[in-house]
Amino acid sequence: MTEFTVHLVNRPGALATLTEQLADAGIAIEALAAFGVDGEGMVRLMVNDPTMTRKILQSDEISFEEREILITTLRHEPDAVAVMTRSLADAGANIDAMYLLRSSAEGLEFAIAVDNHDVAHNILAV
């Protein structure tokens, strides 16, 4: 899955404008995390149509990066995240970003960006 990191001005309405543009194009947001860093708004999002999202961001000259994200589901137990992150670390895979997508009785679904997809793919069995 593709994750976009979008750079916005950190002011009221910036996120609303971005999400309205996506909605107007029929793009569904699958995951979103937004936060301010040193006066800049940063939005990490995954969508159902990366190609159209890329076109919208480029045509509006919005600064962004994109990268491939691994999706994995862990058992819903206290040590699950610790075991996974330790396994990745011991194999030499650095976690660049990680966030929870869903929590349910079936498990914890995470999006993970790593510096070595092959290693992480083998460990996570995704």
Give short role names for the model-derived ranges:
Residues 1-126:
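A conserved regulatory-domain signal marking ACT and ACT-like small-molecule sensing domains
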